[in-house]
C-alpha cells in the first residue's frame, strides 16, 4: 500500500463541510471547484510565495489578501470569499488543521539553536517587518564577553547608541570567568551566541517569513535595545500603499500595525510620518492627535501643559528603558493613531455613499466592504455600530445590482433580516446569475423567436385578408346572379295569359301580334344583351 501526501489543499477538500461552515461564519460562500482553481492556479501567480498545494502561513495569506483587495483593475473581487476563508482557517485553525500549523514564535528571547549549516539563499522578507541580512564583508571579530551560565551574548562594540537616554550596561552581572574570542582575518564560524548579534545573525528557518527586528526589543540581560527602521522597509511601505489623501483607511491600518508590532520611539514615529505623509497631511494628523488628549477628568482638554506633556511637538526626554518612559510612548502612539483616524474622515457627504453601486461582476461581499469604507470616509458614522446596521442594510439593498436588489426587497420578513442574512442571500443570487455567454445566447434565442412570431403573424394576416376578399367577392357574385334570376322570373309573372286568337301586342282578339295593325313597321334593331359580372371585374 502506498502512502498519500497530505497537503493544505487536500486537507481542506477532505473537510469541505467544515470549510463551508467557516465560510458561512464569515458571511461568505465558497465552491469547491473555484477553491481548487484559485489555490492551485491563480494565487501562485501573484509572486508572494503561495505554493500550488496551499499553505496555512498567515504572512503569505495576508500578502495574497492584499493582492485580492487591491483597488482598481488590479483587484480580484471574485476571490475575496476564498482568501477570507483561508485566513480564518489559518488564524483560528480547527482541530484537523492544528497539526499542520507551525507554532507561533515567542517575542521573548530564547536559547539559540545551532544551525545545521550556512544557508545559501537569503532569508525571505516580510512586507511589513524590517529584516537584516547577514553581512558578507570580512572583518575581524570583536572581543566578546561570554557568561558561565550559558545566557545570551550581547556584542557591545557592534551595537548602535540609542537615540536618546543612556542605556545601562548590557553585560551580565557576576565575577565569573571571562573568555575572549580570538581575532582572525576570516569570518568566524557560526555559533549559538553569534546568532544573537546584530549583523551576524543566521537566516531564519525555512518556514519562518516574519522578521523579529523591532525598534524596541528585549536584549540578553532583559533590557530594551533600539533597532531602527530600515530604509528599504520605509521605501516599500510608501510605494506599495496609496497616499493618505487617496485612501486614509488603508494607510491608517498599515501605520496601526507598525505601531503595534514595532513599538517605535518618538523619533521613529516622526520618521514614519515624514515618509508616508505629506507635510500638510502630517500637520493635520498632529493637530487631530492633540485634540484627542484627555485631562485628569477623562474629557478632552486644551490646557497647553497637559497637551504638550501627552503629545509633544518637540523631541521629549523620554527614556524607553524606564516604565515611565514606556508609558509615555504607549500614550503617544495611541493619540497618534486617534489623530490618523480623525484626520482621515472627510466632511459628511451622503451623496458619495449613495454613489457606491455594485459592479456587474462584483461579489456582494466586496461591494459591502466598499460601502462600509464609504461610510467611514464620508460620514461620521461607524458601519460596524449595531445602531447603524439598518442604514447600512438599506443602502446595501438599494445600491446592489438591480437583479439582486429586487429579489432582496421581496424577501419575507425583511425587517428581521440582519446584514449577514442579506449578504448570504445576495451571494446565492450572485452565484446563480447567468454568464455573459449565456446572456448572449438568451438574447439571440429571444430575437429569433420574436422574428419567427412576427413572420407567422404576417402570414396569418395575409391569409385572413385573402379569405375576407374571397368571401366579399362570393357575396357580390351571388347577389348579381340572384338579381338576374329574379328579373327573369318577375318578367314571366307579369306577362298576362293570352287567348288563342288574342294579340300579344295590343291585347285585342281576332289577330296575332305579327299581324297587329297597331304595331309599328320597320327594321328590327339588335336585341340588347345582358352582361354578367365576372370575378375579373
Swiss-Prot record:
Lipidation (N-myristoyl glycine): 2
UniProt KW Metal-binding keyword: yes
Keyword annotations of the record: Capsid protein, Coiled coil, Host cell membrane, Host cytoplasm, Host endosome, Host membrane, Host-virus interaction, Lipoprotein, Membrane, Metal-binding, Myristate, Phosphoprotein, RNA-binding, Ubl conjugation, Viral budding, Viral budding via the host ESCRT complexes, Viral matrix protein, Viral nucleoprotein, Viral release from host cell, Virion, Zinc, Zinc-finger
GO MF annotations in UniProt: RNA binding; structural constituent of virion; zinc ion binding
Positions with biased composition (Basic and acidic residues): 433-474, 485-518
Residues carrying Phosphoserine: 191
GO CC aspect terms: host cell plasma membrane; host multivesicular body; membrane; viral nucleocapsid
Site (Cleavage): 129-130, 214-215, 477-478
Region annotated Interaction with host PIAS4, chain positions: 344-392
Region ranges (Interaction with host UBE2I): 429-434
TM annotation in the entry: none
Motif (PTAP/PSAP motif): 109-112
Post-translational modification: RNA-binding phosphoprotein p12 is phosphorylated on serine residues.
Motif PPXY motif in this chain: 161-164
One Pfam family, short name: Gag_p12
Residues in coiled coil: 448-470
UniProt xrefs under Gene3D superfamilies: Gamma-retroviral matrix domain (1.10.150.180), Human Immunodeficiency Virus Type 1 Capsid Protein (1.10.375.10), Zinc finger, CCHC-type (4.10.60.10)
GO biological process, one term: viral budding via host ESCRT complex
Name used for this protein in its record: Gag polyprotein
Species assigned in the record: Murine leukemia virus (strain BM5 eco)
Gene name of the record: gag
Amino acid at each position: 500500500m502506498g502512502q498519500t501526501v497530505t497537503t493544505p489543499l487536500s486537507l481542506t477538500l477532505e473537510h469541505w463541510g467544515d470549510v463551508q461552515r467557516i465560510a458561512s461564519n464569515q458571511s461568505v460562500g465558497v465552491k469547491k471547484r473555484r477553491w481548487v482553481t484559485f489555490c492551485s492556479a491563480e494565487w501562485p501567480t501573484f509572486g508572494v510565495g503561495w505554493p500550488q498545494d496551499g499553505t496555512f502561513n498567515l504572512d503569505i495569506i495576508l500578502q495574497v489578501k492584499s493582492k485580492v483587495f487591491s483597488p482598481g483593475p488590479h483587484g480580484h473581487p471574485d476571490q475575496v470569499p476564498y482568501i477570507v476563508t483561508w485566513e480564518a482557517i489559518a488564524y483560528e485553525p480547527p482541530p484537523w488543521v492544528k497539526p499542520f500549523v507551525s507554532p507561533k514564535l515567542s517575542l521573548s528571547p530564547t536559547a539559540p539553536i545551532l544551525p545545521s549549516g550556512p544557508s545559501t539563499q537569503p532569508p525571505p522578507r516580510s512586507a511589513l517587518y524590517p529584516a537584516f541580512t547577514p553581512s558578507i564583508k570580512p572583518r575581524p571579530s570583536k572581543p566578546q564577553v561570554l557568561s558561565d551560565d550559558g545566557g545570551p551574548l550581547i556584542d557591545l562594540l557592534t551595537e548602535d547608541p540609542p537615540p536618546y537616554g543612556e542605556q545601562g550596561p548590557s553585560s551580565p552581572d557576576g565575577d565569573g570567568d571571562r573568555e575572549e574570542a580570538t581575532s582572525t582575518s576570516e569570518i568566524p564560524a557560526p555559533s549559538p551566541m553569534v546568532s544573537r548579534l546584530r549583523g551576524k545573525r543566521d537566516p531564519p528557518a525555512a518556514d519562518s517569513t516574519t522578521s523579529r527586528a523591532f525598534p524596541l526589543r528585549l536584549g540578553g540581560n532583559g533590557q530594551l535595545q533600539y533597532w531602527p527602521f530600515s530604509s528599504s522597509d520605509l521605501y516599500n511601505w510608501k510605494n506599495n500603499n496609496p497616499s493618505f489623501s487617496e485612501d486614509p483607511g488603508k494607510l491608517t491600518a498599515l501605520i496601526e500595525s507598525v505601531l503595534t508590532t514595532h513599538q517605535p520611539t518618538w523619533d521613529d514615529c516622526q520618521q514614519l510620518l515624514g515618509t508616508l505623509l505629506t507635510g500638510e497631511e502630517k500637520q493635520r494628523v498632529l493637530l487631530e492627535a492633540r485634540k484627542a488628549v484627555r485631562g485628569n477628568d477623562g474629557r478632552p482638554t486644551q490646557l497647553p501643559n497637559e497637551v504638550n506633556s501627552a503629545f509633544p511637538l518637540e523631541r521629549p526626554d523620554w527614556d524607553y528603558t524606564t516604565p515611565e518612559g514606556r508609558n509615555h510612548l504607549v500614550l503617544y502612539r495611541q493619540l497618534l493613531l486617534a489623530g490618523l483616524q480623525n484626520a482621515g474622515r472627510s466632511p459628511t457627504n451622503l451623496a458619495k455613499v449613495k454613489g457606491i453601486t455594485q459592479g456587474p461582476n462584483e461579489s456582494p461581499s466586496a461591494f459591502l466592504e466598499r460601502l462600509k469604507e464609504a461610510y467611514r470616509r464620508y460620514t461620521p458614522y461607524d458601519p460596524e455600530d449595531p445602531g447603524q446596521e439598518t442604514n447600512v442594510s438599506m443602502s446595501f439593498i438599494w445600491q446592489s445590482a438591480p437583479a439582486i436588489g429586487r429579489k432582496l426587497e421581496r424577501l419575507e420578513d425583511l425587517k428581521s433580516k440582519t446584514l449577514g442574512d442579506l449578504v448570504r442571500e445576495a451571494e446565492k443570487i450572485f452565484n446563480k446569475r447567468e454568464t455573459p455567454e449565456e446572456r448572449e445566447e438568451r438574447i439571440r434565442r429571444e430575437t429569433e423567436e420574436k422574428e419567427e412570431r412576427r413572420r407567422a403573424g404576417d402570414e396569418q394576416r395575409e391569409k385572413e385578408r385573402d379569405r375576407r376578399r374571397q368571401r366579399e367577392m362570393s357575396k357580390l357574385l351571388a347577389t348579381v346572379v340572384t338579381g338576374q334570376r329574379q328579373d327573369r322570373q318577375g318578367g314571366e309573372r307579369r306577362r298576362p295569359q293570352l287567348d288563342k286568337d288574342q294579340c300579344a301586342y295590343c291585347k285585342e282578339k281576332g289577330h296575332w301580334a305579327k299581324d297587329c295593325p297597331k304595331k309599328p313597321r320597320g327594321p328590327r334593331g339588335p336585341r340588347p344583351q345582358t352582361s354578367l359580372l365576372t370575378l375579373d371585374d
